[in-house]
């Protein structure tokens, strides 16, 4: 049984539907606020990665998911570069339970988008003539589980305080 047949069989059994309609760059920014002086310094940067995800319901079973990355490279107190990417996708997700939908929007879809965002960051850093930057993989499943634990703890704390 080939992979397409297996996927079709799995979808028929569960009734769940998942389709990538489109992946696109929603917003991009690259800044080198301390150039050209920063190019004269020894390249020993501290690289910081911030990421965030959000989703919007566009239609019944159609969602936009946006993965926002901010990469900041600093040498001492000076910012070498600041790169911001919003990588987005439009996904069809139907016939799934609410908890499964939340996981797909908060972890599965960002996993799909991350390689595109990572490539965009790498290309922008390269065009800025900085040494190559390859972002490490991100475990969105673990981040989503941590987020859900925080929400549960906050809800429990709110009920205790009430």
UniProtKB/Swiss-Prot annotation:
> Keyword Cytoplasm on this protein?
yes
Q: Which family does it belong to?
A: Belongs to the SecB family.
Organism listed in the record: Pseudoalteromonas translucida (strain TAC 125)
Where located? Cytoplasm
Q: What does this protein do?
A: One of the proteins required for the normal export of preproteins out of the cell cytoplasm. It is a molecular chaperone that binds to a subset of precursor proteins, maintaining them in a translocation-competent state. It also specifically binds to its receptor SecA.
Which keywords accompany this UniProt record? Answer: Chaperone, Cytoplasm, Protein transport, Translocation, Transport
Entry keyword annotation includes Transferase: no
By its UniProt entry, which Gene3D superfamilies does this protein fall under? SecB-like (3.10.420.10)
One Gene Ontology cellular component annotation held by this UniProt entry: cytoplasm
**Biological processes, Gene Ontology terms:** protein folding; protein tetramerization; protein transport
> What quaternary structure, including any partners, is listed in this protein's UniProt entry?
Homotetramer, a dimer of dimers. One homotetramer interacts with 1 SecA dimer.
The main location class comes to cytoplasm
Q: List, alphabetically, the Pfam families matched.
A: SecB
Q: Name one GO molecular function term.
A: unfolded protein binding
Name of encoding gene: secB
InterPro entries documented for this protein:
SecB (IPR003708), SecB-like_sf (IPR035958)
**This protein is called what?**
Protein-export protein SecB
